[in-house]
């Protein structure tokens, strides 16, 4: 039996101190892009969320080169998601002994990268393996309702 090699690596950043909606705005721009194109996009975007995402993309690429020995030119971001994390709650003292609650939102960012050169090799092997399950052809017959008299001519 052939041992299937992993073609995906990931980097996970937890408890990043920013809103999940603001991070999603940046993540939506880089999903499905190549590694080099992602770096250019993140360096030129003027959002605060770009820096932690850029660090995660670098980390995922380093994981791919170390764990799989893949080249960075073959990497594509296959999955990128942002989930809401815990909310840090603090109290700010105000006048006359009162306090004002401060809610600091956090998020968890996951970047999954796929090596397309390894994916192509295993895609060819799996397509050769699945030939025994053929789908039966279900050719539909065409009935002309107007020339045959329709359903109501049968008595």
Curated annotation (Swiss-Prot):
One of its GO terms (molecular function) is structural constituent of ribosome. SUPFAM superfamilies: Ribosomal protein L22. GO terms for biological process: translation. GO terms for cellular component: chloroplast; large ribosomal subunit. Signal peptide: none annotated. The keyword NADP does not apply. It is found in: Plastid, Chloroplast. NCBIfam families: rplV_bact (TIGR01044). Belongs to the universal ribosomal protein uL22 family. Part of the 50S ribosomal subunit. This protein binds specifically to 23S rRNA. The globular domain of the protein is located near the polypeptide exit tunnel on the outside of the subunit, while an extended beta-hairpin is found that lines the wall of the exit tunnel in the center of the 70S ribosome. This is Large ribosomal subunit protein uL22c. The lineage of its organism: Eukaryota, Viridiplantae, Streptophyta, Embryophyta, Tracheophyta. The gene is rpl22.
